[in-house]
């Protein structure tokens, strides 16, 4: 982590690292925590395969997205409109719809987190968290505040997850075997995990932040790559240690007190009563970072087509946060099922946006300043697109089973 201190003594985060952390923290939000806990209980060591596949897809997707958007200096929807008329509006519609569902799940996650941390009702916890998130976008230097919040909450999340791994001492050898020889692992968990950590708004959060910081063009290619790899590595480490922490609990055969809250029950099994409070802090931190990243990225899409969003960007972000909070409080859907469902929806969105990005690399060099795109990177991206497209189609009929 590279940070500097200004004259005021306050934490200053370089925009490049801020973009990387925005992507990484959004990718390892409450959706991933919920998915990892739930599916690890169901599939055990075999779920390691899904984690590894999601990491591979993440590398292929993010390296292509950051490079194409970074070099072009255009956000995804604007670039899409130049490739195919109307494509930008279609992409924005899908991303925004997925993001709204995901953000309701994120708000639900903050409510569940404060419920475990402080004992408050999840809806009250969600309301408190929504107000705090809105407060961040009321300050004068919004993105500076966002970067600082990401650093602090990210540190809390990473530290507590590592503590879970140390406490559970997972059988790494079994997890390694499950990675290469998964048994009884269907496509839906893989799609859901990819959607919750790579798909939807998450695909573009870091790159859009990079563009807002002005780090664009071929001259900034090294910095673009460094930012992409930083975000990818942080997200991958979080995924690995979180899975290992939950697998450590599952491997011992520990009884989970509440199967509808597999993540919280795992912390309870690992640390005792205090574990629920630690889990609450982790889940709340994950929810807050995802709410912020989601709302910001959604607004960057809407600003191309909705003038009030463009002229009052921060207010638009506040409206998005408030909308998600109100919908969750009114709907009363259980946090766990909503988070898993949101991940599956985003997994269906992923192939659409990635196809446009890869088309620019393959056929529209004029949009990336004539840059000769690496064939290896393009090939990896195409392979990732084929996998996500097949998985999305294959799992369309399975989404209803999430709520059964």
Map each language-model feature to its residues.
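Membrane-interface "cap" regions at the ends of multi-pass membrane proteins
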Residues: 1-34, 189-192, 216-230
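Flexible loop linkers connecting adjacent transmembrane helices
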Residues: 2-3, 36-38, 63-87, 114, ...
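Juxtamembrane transmembrane-helix boundary signature
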Residues: 23, 50-83, 90-98, 246
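Selective recognition of specific alpha-helical transmembrane segments in multi-pass small-molecule
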Residues: 49-64, 157, 225-250, 388
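Hydrophobic transmembrane alpha-helices that form the core helical bundles
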Residues: 71, 88-119, 126-130, 284-304, ...
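Transmembrane alpha-helical segments of multi-pass small-molecule transport proteins
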Residues: 92-93, 117-139, 155-165, 307-330, ...
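Membrane-interface loop-to-helix entry segments
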Residues: 129, 138-168, 181-184, 342-350, ...
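Hydrophobic alpha-helical segments and their helix-loop junctions in multi-pass secondary transporters
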Residues: 155-181, 190-208, 354-368, 391-403
